[in-house]
Regions:
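Structural marker of alpha-solenoid helical repeat scaffolds
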Residues: 485, 519, 553, 587, ...
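Canonical positions in the second alpha-helix
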Residues: 482, 515-516, 549-550, 583-584, ...
Length: 763
């Protein structure tokens, strides 16, 4: 239960100064006589400030954003906290730095419930709250949905098997805006807070027409086309509010989470370096009481939350670390220091993290070889002045230490946490290594400078792209090349193992995972992957040892407990599997998944009443849980409740249309009930869903034979026998063929099939 919001922060004298922004002035209170009624927060992913017309880019086609900039506040020097989506949005929503909220990367990090979000503050004040996101990295499972009455994420990971990485799982901005407009139109009487996240500027750059054709066929042109398309979606939102009369009473905030390097300093996208192309962001605010103004002062992403709340007449909760920017709206000065960081090089590759501070002109980057830039004279950050201005370097280094000391929270040193089993299972198909970091990468020791490692980083990125494009041998070669240059990258061995596994080279994959463990014998990801590879090879005892070792290192790791329980079921030890499941349930780990696994183990133990109870509890936790209804169907069949079994299998197919086992079991029940034509339909569905399902093909052959389709019966009987059906079912194929040949008058062939059936070993 989240603790009650604490409205204890007093907005300082700067808020009183906000009175001069609007006319007429008011004499009483900190806030304008009529504050905005609603808040529309639009976060534009991966948008560099210098790619908008309002920020001086001549090639931009961003009329709606430029018009918004002219009508309100345009902050010319805004800096993000991290050039990654989830950490930046966690700061946007809480007004705190990553060192406080603990979210420092995408995947494996979670915004814990203890942190108070903008949505929670506004919901407590009576606002309708709706969040609409365009990327899986902002899915609710990462904690970012706190406080939203309606949160549109709903990413089906099974549809993204060809995605290059986790951050490639996205949806078009038009779909996000459609959902937001539907929600906005459903209720007009209650004040609203809508957060609309548009991911389109993020790579891959695949803008829809007519935008794509308006720009050169280059990487830069494709990026600009995405921004133009995003601008049009922003326009749709503003037009809808204008049409129903609510725009005039709405505070509109547009901000980016981070920028894009576009090849500068050797980085193609973002996340690795913290140079200006990745950290300088657009920030616009327009609405009642805000006079148009270009603000040159340094501001930060963490300042958005307290500023928006101040404009709405609401005090910011403790411990917001950002500042209200209302003094700047009046034309006063604020001497703010921006702080940025990237732990991505360290968490993923074992190289040094990067941290920086800047005051609007001078920027200091703490790295193994420190960097100092005069942004006024050297906007491209190409002239490192660290050796030329030691006094300024020392002053900014001290400022960095002070900021980090003041903003650090208990979560800062935790590092990534395990991803839930369901997500991990699906992300593994993307070659994504997440939620597990080498112990060595968390230790404080001298590390490689990312400036020297950008070539290796790009090589590993290209390896991932090659894998997605089906060039798996090329991806393996690239990882091996990277390891030849730097054999200490534990995550590279993990990637190599994943690629080798994808190439169906399990022994080499096992060797790669073992090498990762040689580098770090407590690397949970390597332990887990090695155990899983053993399990896939049928080396169940070796797999059990690996999972037990991983469990001892992290007893709450849901994916380890899940695989261990599943392994014990495979070994025919349902009682031991149930003990693991009950341990997970006692720890409140992924309850719906483990209730399902408990039900499965109880079915194996023929405890059907207990299994029914467990499976129903799993569905209460997650109504759309795959295989839960299938297992209930098994229970009801055993209990002789055929109507309920039929309903359960039908329900499984509605939830998961690819559930071939549910179709098969449903067909068998219908066949036994004399509903041959319906049974035939579901037998066909089962073998269409699983083309090598030999047992299902033999049942289909028998159903077709009973219906008089001799040609179909012969074809499917032969196919079923070729696809290695269950031994107990294999004789059926020969008997179907014998029956077909008898009906055709081919007695010798019929006798041959009967003899073949009798020669089969008993099933």
């Amino acid at each position: 239960m989240k603790r009650a919001l604490l409205a204890v922060v007093v907005i300082g004298a700067g808020l009183a100064a906000w009175a001069a922004v609007a006319r007429p002035r008011w004499a009483h209170g900190l806030f304008p006589p009529k504050a905005p009624r609603n808040l529309l927060l639009i976060s534009l992913d991966t948008l560099r400030a210098d790619r908008l017309g309002s920020y001086g880019y001549a090639q931009a086609q961003t009329p709606r954003l430029d018009a918004l900039a002219r009508s309100g506040l345009r902050f010319e020097t805004a800096t993000t906290v991290v050039p990654l989506t989830l950490p930046a949005h966690s700061s946007l929503m809480t007004g705190t730095f990553p060192a406080w909220h603990g979210v420092r990367d995408n995947g494996g990090f979670y915004l814990d419930d203890e942190h108070i979000t903008l949505a929670e503050v506004l919901r407590e004040k009576g606002y309708r709250t709706g969040g609409f996101v365009g990327a899986f990295v902002l899915d609710r499972r990462w904690g970012i949905a706190q406080g939203f009455d309606r949160f549109f994420d709903d990413f089906d990971l099974d549809k993204f098997a060809d995605a290059a990485s986790m951050d490639s799982i996205q949806r078009p901005g038009a779909q996000v805006v459609d959902q937001a407009l539907t929600w906005l139109g459903a209720e007009r009487r209650v004040p609203f807070f809508a957060w609309v996240h548009l991911y389109d500027p993020h790579a891959p750059y695949e803008a829809p027409e007519p935008f794509r054709s308006r720009f050169p066929r280059t990487v830069q042109g494709a990026y600009d086309a995405e921004i133009a398309a995003t601008d049009a979606e922003v326009g749709r939102l503003l037009d809808a509010l204008q049409a129903d009369g609510r725009l005039a009473e709405t505070l509109v905030v547009v901000v980016s989470d981070h920028g894009e390097m576009l090849g500068e300093h050797g980085e193609q996208t973002h996340g690795f370096f913290i140079y200006e192309p990745a950290t300088r962001i657009p920030m616009l605010m327009a609405g009642p009481g805000l006079a148009p103004r270009a603000v040159p002062d340094q501001v930060r992403l963490v300042d958005v939350m307290p500023t928006a709340l101040a404009l709405l007449g609401i005090e910011a909760p403790k411990p917001v670390q950002g500042m209200s920017l209302l003094p700047l709206a009046r034309g006063e000065r604020m001497d703010l220091i921006a702080h940025s960081e990237s732990w991505y090089p360290r968490y993923h590759y074992g190289w040094s993290e990067l941290r920086s501070v800047q005051d609007g002109r001078f920027k200091y980057v703490r790295a193994p070889r420190p960097e100092l830039y005069d942004l006024e004279r050297d906007a491209s950050e190409s002239q490192n002045r660290a050796g030329d201005d030691p006094a300024r370097l020392e002053a900014l280094a001290q400022a960095l230490d002070e900021i980090e000391a003041k903003t650090k929270g208990a979560a800062a040193a935790e590092g990534p946490r395990p991803v839930d089993p369901e997500t991990e299972e699906r992300l593994a198909a993307l070659g994504y290594v997440g939620g597990s970091v080498s112990r060595q990468n968390l230790e404080d020791r001298p590390r490689g400078d990312p400036k020297d490692k950008i070539g290796l980083y790009n090589l590993l990125k290209l390896a991932g792209t090659a894998s997605v494009e089906g060039r798996i041998d090329d991806s393996i070669a690239k990882v091996r090349q990277a390891l030849a240059e730097d054999p200490e990258i534990v995550e590279a061995y993990m990637l190599l193992g994943n690629f080798l596994k994808k190439a169906k080279r399990p022994d080499e994959a096992i060797a790669a995972y073992r090498t990762a463990l040689d580098k770090d014998d407590e690397h949970q990801g390597a332990l887990f992957s090695l155990a899983l590879a053993y399990k896939d090879k049928g080396l169940l005892e070796e797999a059990r040892v690996g999972f037990e070792r991983a469990r001892s290192l992290d007893p709450k790791n849901g994916k380890v407990l899940w695989q261990l329980a599943d392994l014990l079921m495979q070994k025919g030890e349902p009682e031991k599997a149930e003990a693991v499941v009950r341990d997970a349930l006692a720890r409140k780990v992924d309850e719906h998944r483990f209730l399902l696994k408990l039900g499965e183990s109880q079915i194996e133990a023929k405890q059907f009443d207990a299994a029914e109870k467990s499976l129903r509890a799993a569905l209460e936790k997650k109504p759309n849980l795959d295989t839960a209804r299938f297992n209930l169907g098994l229970v009801y069949e055993e209990k002789g409740r055929i109507d309920r079994a039929i309903a359960s299998y039908e329900g499984e197919l509605l939830q998961n249309p690819k559930a071939f086992r549910a179709a098969f079991n449903l067909a068998k029940i219908l066949q036994k009930s004399g509903r041959r034509e319906e049974a035939t339909v579901y037998f066909k569905k089962a073998v269409e869903l699983q083309p090598d399902f030999g047992t299902g093909q033999l049942y289909l052959a028998k159903a077709l034979l009973d219906g008089g389709d001799l040609a179909g019966a012969e074809r499917w009987a032969r196919s079923g026998l070729a696809n290695k059906p269950e031994p107990r079912v294999a004789p059926l194929g020969h008997y179907v063929l014998a029956d077909v040949y008898n009906r055709k008058g081919r007695a010798a062939d019929a006798n041959r099939e009967v003899a073949a059936a009798k020669r089969l070993p008993p099933g």
